[in-house]
């Protein structure tokens, strides 16, 4: 039997800076500090929030193709992304430095 997580929508949780938008979110992950990472196809970037929905940072604008496909956080808090536009899996620090 598969274990399926349950999610609850919290209206107004996400607080993006002015000018930031996103449409296609193809991955969501959390790290050990309860930061939430969205992998978006809009501007091909990762957007990071704190647990209360406050914007922390974004990164990846010059790295990804418009066909990003997923994101995961390892037990060491490294960020792993999948991009099927260039058939890559990449590893990053939580701050967005590619390793």
Each predicted region: which residue ranges?
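Eukaryotic scaffold repeat domains enriched in small/polar residues
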Residues: 1-99
């Amino acid at each position: 039997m598969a274990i399926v997580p349950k999610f609850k929508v919290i209206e107004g949780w996400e607080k993006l800076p002015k000018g930031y938008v996103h449409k296609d979110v193809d991955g969501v992950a959390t790290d050990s500090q309860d930061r939430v990472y969205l992998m978006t196809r809009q501007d091909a970037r990762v957007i990071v929030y704190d647990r209360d929905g406050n914007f922390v940072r974004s990164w990846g604008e010059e790295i990804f193709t418009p066909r990003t496909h997923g994101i995961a956080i390892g037990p060491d808090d490294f960020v792993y992304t999948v991009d099927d536009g260039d058939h890559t899996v990449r590893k990053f620090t939580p701050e967005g430095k590619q390793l």
